[in-house]
């Protein structure tokens, strides 16, 4: 089975204790190990899978439709290994590999690496001549 990138959702909800989810995501580095924890007693979703940093801080959850898929694989005896991939404006991303394989970060295209979407465009500087 091929490695997959999965969204980490719920990143703006507060944690019961410790630092906030978005703060913890901000200090995660691409390639850091990520822990996936099933939450069968979650009152909102019995298939919920919490995503935690290598420091044990909850980052959010895997989207519900992907959580059902991952949970089914676990029940069938498959294993998963996950790493932090990236953070964007609305969610975090993790990379997961299956059955003892090590996840690797996807290649970044030259366009994505060089783009500047900061919204800051300085005024041109003209010579006084």
Question: For each of these PLM feature ranges, what is it?
Answer:
Residues 1-129:
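Conserved active-site motif detector
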């Amino acid at each position: 089975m091929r490695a997959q990138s999965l969204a980490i959702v719920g990143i703006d909800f507060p944690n019961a204790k410790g630092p906030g989810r978005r703060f913890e995501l901000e200090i995660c580095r691409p390639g850091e190990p990520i822990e996936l924890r099933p939450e069968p007693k979650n009152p909102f979703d019995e298939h919920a899978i919490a995503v935690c940093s290598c420091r044990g801080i909850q980052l959010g959850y895997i989207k519900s439709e992907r959580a059902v898929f991952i949970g089914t694989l676990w029940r069938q005896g498959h294993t998963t290994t996950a790493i932090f991939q990236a953070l964007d404006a609305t969610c975090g991303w993790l990379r997961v590999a299956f059955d003892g394989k090590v996840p690797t970060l996807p290649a970044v295209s030259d366009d994505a690496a060089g783009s500047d979407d900061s919204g800051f465009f300085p005024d041109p500087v003209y010579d006084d001549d």
